[in-house]
């Protein structure tokens, strides 16, 4: 039977980082961070047992002047805590003002964005403002595999050279920070201030609910809305994608009801109070796998003065070759309901099957 051991270390005089030694083959340990004896956050990391593959930093700046306790539970089978103390990680677990993030990887992409360290996938909440592109993304800062979902953050003036920033939104008591989208609230509809950046994302804990965070400094730091969740459904749903609909004068949000094989459409005057207007997808298109990461957009019809609405639905798995894919539906949208032009049994795939996959 697996038994957890608990090791505590109290830090008062903080340096910039706590460096965590990682071994890829080790089981996950749980690190609970307590601030002034109250739970602040929790994450999993594969703390080194036999050898150290690399170090990852835990940023401490936000805790300066506070008493921080790290409550670490290892995942190994032990007979007593002394066995856990022999693990390789304890020799190199240390405080530091520096972290070596030099890129020594020969095969790291040059033009494609990658984080300085850690694991990433879905791009989230992208926006352009004041001459800069902002990219948020699903990010695990504590290992090279999926887990500990945060919103990482980078910015660029040319979409080639990227400046990396601290994590924008991190998990809290409502759960991990899954995919979502963001908008520039030019008219202060939410009441947080003109040109505030509003992010809506899925909080994934015991259930999947939708949360809001806002930024008053062009997306560099976010404040989590105190009245979250803003949408709580009785079924699994995720990946909110929102936009302003001029004709109805409301914000529209599309939410993937993953296991129902549907997209739910909501409207709001203020980004905080949402009304479910309709659903689309039951019996339509590819019904295999999980529906997720939707998008709904109005596009011009080539050679005419008309427009059509396109609803993009990512699935995983269920693609033509068995893996992930993106399907799309063409139709009309009146601010409440999406009406598809084609019959339910017709499935339209994006040209490369995956190039639109899991974007927000």
Region locations from a protein language model:
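Conserved small/polar residues in nucleotide/adenosyl-binding loops
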Residues: 2-9, 354-360
């Amino acid at each position: 039977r697996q038994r957890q051991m608990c090791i505590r270390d109290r830090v008062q005089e903080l340096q910039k980082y706590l460096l965590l030694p990682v071994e890829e083959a080790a089981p996950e340990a749980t690190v609970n961070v307590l601030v002034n004896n109250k739970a602040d956050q929790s994450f999993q990391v594969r703390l080194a047992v036999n050898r150290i593959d690399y170090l990852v930093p835990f940023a401490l700046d936000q805790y300066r002047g506070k008493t921080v306790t790290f409550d670490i539970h290892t995942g190994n089978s032990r007979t007593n805590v002394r066995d856990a103390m022999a693990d390789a990680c304890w020799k190199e677990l240390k405080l530091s003002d520096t972290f070596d993030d030099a890129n020594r990887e020969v095969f790291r992409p040059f033009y494609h964005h990658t984080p300085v360290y850690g694991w990433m996938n879905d791009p989230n909440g992208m926006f352009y403002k004041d001459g800069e592109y902002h990219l948020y993304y699903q990010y695990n800062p504590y290992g090279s595999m999926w887990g500990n979902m945060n919103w990482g953050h980078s910015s660029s003036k040319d979409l080639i050279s990227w400046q990396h920033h601290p994590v924008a939104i991190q998990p809290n008591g409502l759960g991990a920070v899954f995919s979502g989208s963001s908008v520039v609230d030019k008219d202060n509809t939410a009441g947080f201030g003109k040109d505030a950046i509003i992010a809506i994302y899925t909080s994934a804990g015991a259930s999947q609910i939708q949360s809001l965070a806002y930024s008053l400094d062009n997306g560099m730091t976010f404040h989590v809305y105190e009245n979250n969740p803003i949408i709580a459904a009785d079924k699994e749903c995720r990946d909110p994608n929102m936009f302003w609909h001029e004709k109805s004068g409301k914000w529209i949000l599309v939410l993937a009801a993953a296991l129902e094989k549907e997209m739910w459409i909501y409207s709001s005057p203020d980004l905080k109070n949402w009304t479910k207007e309709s659903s689309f997808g039951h019996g339509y298109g590819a019904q295999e796998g999980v529906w997720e990461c939707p998008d709904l957009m109005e596009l011009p019809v080539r050679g005419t003065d008309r427009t059509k609405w396109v609803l993009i639905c990512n699935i995983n798995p269920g693609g033509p070759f068995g893996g992930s894919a993106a399907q799309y539906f063409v139709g009309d949208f009146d601010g409440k309901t999406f009406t598809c032009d084609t019959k339910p049994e017709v499935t339209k795939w994006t040209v490369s099957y995956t190039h639109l996959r899991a974007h927000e």
